[in-house]
Amino acid sequence: MGEIQIKSDVVLKGYWKRDEANAESIVDEWFYTGDAGFFDEDGFLFIHDRVKDMIISGGENIYPAEVENALMSHPDIIDAAVVGVPDDKWGETVKAFVILSEGKIQSEADIISYSKEQIASYKCPTSVDFINDIPRNPSGKILRRVLREPFWEEKGRNVS
């Protein structure tokens, strides 16, 4: 898995009046999409997640979509989002925000235990907040920066 890069005559030449964004996204005429993906054995490209959303915990790369899919397989969870939050030992750790089905009760320990049955333990949330709404943009994408901001305000996100 790696960051998807494209080069073509029909790829944008740059962002209008955004020199810093251009320097980050376009290198030697290659456009770095910001998406992490991979090719399968048949040559099909699969987009897995956004590189900037990747959580780095103890040197391990954790993609939020994988953790969210594991959480969403729980019968009592109707929506979930995860972000990386500061951790003195690991750099970042996974924090989950979960919406439960109406009338359902689960503890933080229940959700963490369930996730350990679904994915590798280093990818599992170390804390869970039960919330009523997950912030999304008009196209339905999770606004991770809104969820992440309160935890990084004092520190500044020190991992890429």
Per-region residue spans from a language model:
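AMP-binding/adenylate-forming catalytic domain of the ANL superfamily
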Residues: 117-141, 160
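Acidic/polar alpha-helix N-cap and adjacent early helical turns
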Residues: 150-160
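AMP-binding/adenylate-forming catalytic core of the ANL superfamily
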Residues: 8-9, 13-14, 36-123, 140, ...
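FAD-site-proximal beta/loop scaffold in flavoenzymes
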Residues: 29
